[in-house]
Amino acid sequence: MNARIYCLSDKILLGKTSNKSIQYVSKCLFSKGFRIDEIQILPNNVTENFDDITKFEGRQNLFVYLLDSQISYPQILNGICQKTGVEKTISNIAKTVIQSRYSSKNIPMPKESADCQFVPEGAYGVGNIYSDIQCVVLSRKNDFYLIMSNGEQEIETYLDKMLTFVLQNQPQYKQCQTFKTFGLSEQNIKQVLADLIKNKDKISINVYSDNLDSEIIIRSKSEQVAFNEYVGKVFSRLNKYIYAEEAITMEQTLFKLLSNANLCVSFGESITHGNIVNSLMTANPEFSKYIKATYVFQDAKNICDRISAKTSTIQNFGNSSVETIFEVSSNIINETGSDIVCGVVGSFENEVCKSYVAVGDKNAIHVYKNTFCAPFCEAIDSTTKATLFYLIKKLRQNDFHFDKKTV
């Protein structure tokens, strides 16, 4: 099924809030087998003809409308009703939820909130306890129209239930395989798999990317031998970029590997300013059981003082170099006695982040150079993920590609 997402949000357009909700919705749709054809961010007050944002016909489609404000609700509702020829009606569920919210506060109901009591006749609805914008799905012919609030709490609470209604009569996939990769963009992956994606065996291959962290989902609606052949080909072509063979994050993958092997790791960070360890602890506080020590280095003096690195090494090669991170990592693993060491140093200038990542044990430490061209926060995030990726590959297979210097 094809999907289009329309987010009506002045706040996102003005840069007052992030578009995390859009990312969450698109990833959720993708994981359930939807193909996302378009994502648009529009102002709260939609001035375009409604037909302009319901463009495609003749296929089974899902239109998702994420609303930031109550003023958008009647506009979208009226547009859907006019397009489908359905009348508006007051929903008892919406009426009860909205009226109880204002009666409990002992304040009159605004007109914008009263308008949110209306839904298309015959629509499926779920009462939203967090805001006046209700969760509504209308099914007409080949199309589904989903309206809901853009709030993260509402989306996390109600989206899955609404999509379950949409998919309840759809053919279910009987075979499914997921691969998680790092290091290739969505466009790069689609180029590598182009001939497999355009197949005649009705094997669905979809790619969803968050920067360089990607998810490839292979599906089939019937049991067939060809499915395993496609899985094998995808794995063969992307093997060196794959860090998991299920729909889990890097942090979840790393935790499974460390806990299963009962290994501890020590970290040394400069350019990432502690972001690596912070991302792990935020994802799962249980990581504390497997993190032996952490070092965050602010400058060259700090490196020398904390882990006894030679001043001459930094003077000769600089704060960010293969030699420096190798010596830093060697000293860390010797001083802490951890099973694994993981270190990163780097520099950021003119939206170019150059870093050196060291991963290894007492037998061998290997250093990898990464270059990311992006704004600071995005570059640090990519450097953090690249570091975790190398660590995962070390723990999984010890299959480093020593001739590769950039991700």
Language model regions located:
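Glycine-rich phosphate/diphosphate-binding loop of Rossmann-like nucleotide-binding domains
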Residues: M1-I41
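Gly/Ser/Thr-rich loops at beta-strand to alpha-helix junctions
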Residues: K11-N19, L67-Y73, N150-E154, L212, ...
